[in-house]
Amino acid sequence: MAIIFALVARGTVVLSEFSATSTNASSISKQILEKLPGNDSDSHMSYSQDRYIFHVKRTDGLTVLCMADETAGRNIPFAFLDDIHQRFVKTYGRAIHSAQAYSMNDEFSRVLSQQMEFYSNDPNADRMSRIKGEMSQVRNVMIENIDKVLDRGERLELLVDKTENMQGNTFRFRKQARRYRTIMWWRNVKLTIALILVLALVVYIAMAFVCHGPSLPSCFK
């Protein structure tokens, strides 16, 4: 799965988050939030850790962050962040400014999950990201090492469950299962129709024999 973790925060107050697998990305993300510049100027940032990158979009004091596999590039993660920012602002509006930590999590974590799945697995997401990826601020985002940004003497270890692709595989399995059920349903329908036709033919032949002819002359005088 390309995008593994995401959160929405006001300053350092996390309002909603979702993780597609077992990882300590949440605690690392909170440290990133604490180290972001204090002003509320709009910005786009990326921080690398092993083969993962934390992408950050800050707009109007609202921060949207995601952790993605480095193979996802920049366009898809930032298109995802832009999408999430728009959805969050549209859904909660002014309530964002006074919301308590995780007060939107029960509802919006489902949106994060759905959009993470879409941007990680749906081919249409790549086309959308190419359009949004033309923004100069995305092209010019510098990727810094996260240990340098957090100014830690010891190496920060990111822990990610090796089964991180499970959700993507589950999504594909569900699609295949639905397709298989549809095929089996049509097969059963066709088989039922064929049995009805065969039964009708057998009844007709029997009646034709009893009624002395294909036009059933002795039965319909």
Curated annotation (Swiss-Prot):
It comes from the Eukaryota. GO terms for cellular component: Golgi apparatus; HOPS complex; plasma membrane; vacuolar membrane; vacuole. It holds the Pfam family Longin. Interacts with subunits of the vacuole protein sorting (HOPS) complex including VPS11, VCL1, VPS18, VPS33, VPS39 and VPS41. Residues 2-190 are cytoplasmic. SUPFAM superfamilies: SNARE fusion complex, SNARE-like. Involved in the targeting and/or fusion of transport vesicles to their target membrane. Residues 127-187 form the v-SNARE coiled-coil homology domain. Its main location: membrane. This is Vesicle-associated membrane protein 713. One of its GO terms (biological process) is response to salt stress. The chain crosses the membrane at residues 191-211. The modification N-acetylalanine is found at residue 2. Highly expressed in stems and roots. Detected in flowers and leaves. Residues 7-112 form the Longin domain. It is found in: Vacuole membrane; Prevacuolar compartment membrane. Belongs to the synaptobrevin family. Keywords: Acetylation, Membrane, Protein transport, Transmembrane, Transmembrane helix, Transport, Vacuole. The longin domain is critical for the vacuolar localization. It is a single-pass type IV membrane protein. Disulfide bonds: none annotated. Residues 212-221 are vesicular.
